[in-house]
């Protein structure tokens, strides 16, 4: 990257997640909400990817032969199960500590993931391209959302997909995803999310459309305390996911 160029990296966020790196794979630790969230996002990714690429979602390895980027992969909570679906996965994160934890866990689990301590900009500048880009629970932690989305979009191959998951910038989200989750329920460490860094759907859709991608699906996600599970929902006021495709 040239000197003075814009960057998507918020070093404070990188440092904060690096400090918690040892907790990534603890289902009762600081990343417990992501462990709970994983089944619904994995199901969404599998089903939409199979629909796009003409695969059977019930097969053992439905993503066989597809190249997938998990940007901001953290400790690999998403990278590993996607690799188990047959995909060739690149897990990228700017934190060396996160990548170290992810690599160690994958090796111990017998899962092949290409983990790299790199930024989205570095991958794009190297000309890397993917059938699927996973941009999950990352945009609310970057320094420049528009640049980050544009950079990720560049790496989506013709006919390929980008999945985005984040938290909406609404008062409802401030009350539930920040105040309640961090201060009352203690699901997350205080300071995990800042209201001003939350992202509205249109702020993601605009740079994706400007990059030549078409928004093909939107869904909310909510936590059902009775079933203790996350479910897809029409309500996008708090957690939501977007799907966009680059025309073939």
UniProtKB/Swiss-Prot annotation:
Keyword Kinase among UniProt keywords: no
GO biological process: methylation
UniProt keyword list: Methyltransferase, S-adenosyl-L-methionine, Transferase, Ubiquinone biosynthesis
Biochemical pathway: Cofactor biosynthesis; ubiquinone biosynthesis
UniProt binding sites for S-adenosyl-L-methionine: 41, 72, 93, 136
Keyword S-adenosyl-L-methionine: yes
Enzyme Commission number: 2.1.1.222, 2.1.1.64
Catalyzed chemical reaction(s): a 3-demethylubiquinol + S-adenosyl-L-methionine = a ubiquinol + S-adenosyl-L-homocysteine + H(+); a 3-(all-trans-polyprenyl)benzene-1,2-diol + S-adenosyl-L-methionine = a 2-methoxy-6-(all-trans-polyprenyl)phenol + S-adenosyl-L-homocysteine + H(+)
Major enzyme class: transferase
Entry GO MF terms: 2-polyprenyl-6-hydroxyphenol methylase activity; 3-demethylubiquinol 3-O-methyltransferase activity; polyprenyldihydroxybenzoate methyltransferase activity
UniProt family annotation: Belongs to the methyltransferase superfamily. UbiG/COQ3 family.
Function (record text): O-methyltransferase that catalyzes the 2 O-methylation steps in the ubiquinone biosynthetic pathway.
Protein name (record): Ubiquinone biosynthesis O-methyltransferase
């Amino acid at each position: 990257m040239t000197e003075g160029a814009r960057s998507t990296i918020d070093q404070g966020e990188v440092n904060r997640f690096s400090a918690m790196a040892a907790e990534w794979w603890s289902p009762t630790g600081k990343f417990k909400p992501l462990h709970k969230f994983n089944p619904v996002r994995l199901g969404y990714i599998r089903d939409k990817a199979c629909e796009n690429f003409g695969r059977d979602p019930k097969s053992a390895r439905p993503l066989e032969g597809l190249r997938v980027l998990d940007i901001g992969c953290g400790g690999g909570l998403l990278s590993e199960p996607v690799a188990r679906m047959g995909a060739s996965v690149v897990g990228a994160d700017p934190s060396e500590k996160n990548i170290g934890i992810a690599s160690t866990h994958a090796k111990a689990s017998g899962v092949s993931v290409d983990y790299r301590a790199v930024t989205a900009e570095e991958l794009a500048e190297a000309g890397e391209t993917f059938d699927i880009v996973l941009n999950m629970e990352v945009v609310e932690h970057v320094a420049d959302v528009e640049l980050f989305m544009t950079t990720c979009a560049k790496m989506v191959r013709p006919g390929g997909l980008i999945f985005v998951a984040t938290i909406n910038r609404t008062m409802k989200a401030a009350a539930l995803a920040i105040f309640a989750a961090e201060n009352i329920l203690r699901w997350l460490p205080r300071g995990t999310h800042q209201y001003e860094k939350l992202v509205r759907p249109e702020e993601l859709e605009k740079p994706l459309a400007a990059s030549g991608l078409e928004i093909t699906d939107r869904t909310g996600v909510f936590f059902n305390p009775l079933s203790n599970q996350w479910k897809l929902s029409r309500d996008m006021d708090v957690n939501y996911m977007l799907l966009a495709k680059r025309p073939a």
